[in-house]
Amino acid sequence: MTPTPHLLPPPGPPSRRTVLRWGALGGTGVALGPLSACAGPTGAPGPGTLTLGLNRSLVSLDNKLNQFDAAVTVQRAVRQALTWIGPDLQPRLVLADRFEMTSPTAWSVRLREGVRYSDGSPVTVGDVDTALRMYGKVNGSFLLGLFPEMPTVEATGERTFLLRTERPVPVLDRLMANIHITPAKANRPEELQSGLGSGPYRVVSANGGAGEYTLARNTEYWGKQPPVDKVRVRFVPEESSRVIALRSGELDVVDTLTPDSAEQLAGLPGVAVQETPGVRICQLFYNFRKPEGHPLADARVRHALTYAIDGESLIRDVLIDSAEAAEGVVPLALQGAVRTGTYAYDPRRAKALLKSLDAEDLRITIMWESGEFAGDTSVMEAVVDMLKDVGVRASLRQFEPGGDILKWRQGRGGDWDVIGNGFPGTTGQALTSLQGMYGGTAEKERTRDTYMGYVIPRIERQLSDAATETDAAERDRKLAALQHAVWDTWPSLWAFAPKTLLARRDRVQGLALQPVNSYDLTAVRLEG
């Protein structure tokens, strides 16, 4: 049973940390100045307008390359898929009213009658076919790695078709929740800048460079009209600015909060904080493109370095208990996930092992994109100090949102050693996350479509065998063995599963934060 989101209780007297933080902010008026100057239109939202403040820039309403969870809330309001993953992490029907496995390698699908785009044109079988082909051609796509293979479309009627695969893909109904449908004539194998979709909202204005959008009700929407007239999306990278703007009423909802900010907001008049367990894993993942002979190409060295990291202190003192240390290679909240081990802190052992492996005096570069997870900079700085204590010199490289970190992830931008990265559980299944991270092949690596260069043939074969197993119990057994095998390759220096935190004004009602760190905009209403 998936725990339901809940409101955090009002705090007791403010902690010293909170008092110091508020003192540093210097007051509402001061903070709103720079926010207003750099983040677009200001002032309290109108009575029918919902304003969202995102911590990362939403460069497109197309999800082919966008990877951060909160973007899904907005993208799905404009474009829709055949299915979606509900709050119970089970697939639900959207554009399809039938989605059934009819053989191990075929699924029968029927489009819902009357589904249409915001320009009034119908959603067609050809649009689904084109969407799958366009997603399949995008280089560097996070979503592409989730599919063991991309299905093909075989039309069987005006609204019906078969999705066929060479081998069984028993979770295809879940995977298709990631494929947003666009009119075929407007779709291309790239991140689309246009916003035509079948969702409850249409795009009124868009500035992908600034991460700002205005959405209005889609009067042609085939379903029930949403309660909110207009939605404004703003990119506000500084968390302190998001907090102040929420308190002042300039923003209605802010996502991905640190515990400090949640503590500041909980119990304030007119503000509520929501928390739910998450299905995202955040990792300090090793670069698996290192040549033979490099210390990090040796799993024993990767393992030795993990003893340098005091994960308990990071959880308690830096993340303030807003996360749980990973006990597996995927979050345990995912269906099919199993415990495979824990990260142990033992700096003496780290030093001894590194010395025995002739890997003393290592120098490593750790990179990440700002906003990858709440408190990311503080975590990275603490990790540098911990590595220093065992004789490893680490340098940090931080990328701003919207930059070229994708090239670096693919090994095209330059060399690095460890990356701070979050991987979402978009389908609620451990299998999908395992496929996306550990299903790399030599063929995928030629186009840099692997996860940080992770290509271990025996792991891929084991994963492929599990992924095509149609018997659920047998699949879970194979997946359990696979997860232990992956753990033994030591893919991460450290990893954790963050809880999902969100804050909203009291006038925002009906917002149900889901474990995938998004929510359904059609359920949100404004009161007062």
Where are these regions (language model features)?
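N-terminal lobe/hinge region of extracytoplasmic solute-binding protein
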Residues: L54-T102, R133, L196-G197
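Long beta-strand-rich cores associated with HINT superfamily self-processing modules
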Residues: L502-G528
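Periplasmic binding protein-like
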Residues: L52-G53, I366, K388-A442, K478
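Ligand-site clamp/hinge motif
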Residues: P189, T219-Q264
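Extracytoplasmic/peripheral linker and loop segments enriched in polar/acidic and small residues
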Residues: R393-D404, Q435-R505, G528
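Gly/Pro-rich hinge or "lid" segments in bacterial periplasmic/extracellular proteins
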Residues: Q90, R174-P226, K230
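Append "and occasionally in soluble cytosolic enzymes with long acidic Gly/Pro-rich linkers
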Residues: L296-D385, G453, A481
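Surface-exposed binding/hinge segments that line
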Residues: E100, L144-K185
